[in-house]
């Protein structure tokens, strides 16, 4: 690893800027049998961009499950026959201005942003095992000023949010409650 130059990086987005919502979309299947091209057409983010505000950037469009002719809950519909393929997606957007500002800062360091990932999603992928995500789990990423939340169920990320309370707030509460210094409260917290 020593002597390597980093040129590209993935931008981790967290805090109160990202928004999470569930969307559904249907596409007609002309061949009656669902193939890879039909799945790509169903999860194509092009139609999502037409639904978004100009000030939002889609960072994740994650299929949760599919439906065929109105029958939902299907994980992998390839090879099945239907006239209409539906997809339920978890779409996560963020402020395009915030991403542009952070990207400009990164570019000034002679680096390029290769991709963006939601911080709580990345934390869940790094910390959780498949069984936990399958059974259902909440991953909390407690930062200094915010707590990021990622909910996994049936192996998929189904909800994300952030609340404006973090570790700094806990430290301040300990310091006030015990009438002590912030540094001592920080040591007590850990």
Predicted regions: what they are:
Residues 171:
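Generic structural marker for isolated residues within well-ordered, non-membrane alpha-helices
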